[in-house]
C-alpha cells in the first residue's frame, strides 16, 4: 500500500529529526523544547495505520479500529517492558512513568478485546462457525492469551506497589510475559479472522 509505505518512511524521518533536536538541545534541558515535534511522527504513523487497516480487508471501519487499537495496545505493553529495563539499570528513577504505561495497557485491553470480539470476530472462532484450521485449538489459545494478558497487567501493578527494588525486577519479568500474551491475543485473532 503506497500510502502506508510513504507514511512509514516520513514517520521514521520525523522520529530521527526529533532525536537530533533532542540531542542538540540536551544541554539546555526540557525548558524551551518544542513539544510539538514529538507529535509529528505519531500523527504520520496514524495515517499509515489507517491505510494498513483499509488494506487489511473485511469491513473497513472495523479493520481500521482493530489496527489502531491493536497498535496502541501492543505499543503500550512493549514500551512498558522496555522502560522496565531502564529501571533495572537506573534503580533510582521514580516509578510513575512505568506505572502509567502499565495503566494504559490495562485501559486499552477492554477496547482491544471488544474490537477482536466484534462480529465477525473471535466469538465466531470459539463457537466454531469460523474454522481456525486446528479444530478450535487456536480459539482456546487466544482465550488463554486474552485472560493471561490482563492478569499479568494486574500482577505487574501489584508488584509496582512494593517499595523494594526487586519489585521492579518482578514487574519487568511480568511485562515480558505480558508481551507474549498480548501479541498472542492480537496476532492469533488476526490469523484466525484473516
Role assignments for model-derived ranges:
Residues 1-53, 67-86, 102-126, 135-193:
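Hydrophobic cores of alpha-helical transmembrane segments in multi-pass integral membrane proteins
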Residues 53-63, 128-129:
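Helix-coil boundary and interhelical linker segments in multi-pass alpha-helical membrane proteins
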Residues 59-63, 93-96, 134, 138:
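Membrane-helix interfacial "entry" motifs
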Residues 86-98:
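Cytosolic, membrane-interface loops and tails of multi-pass inner-membrane proteins
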Residues 95, 127-130:
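Juxtamembrane/interface segments of multi-pass membrane proteins
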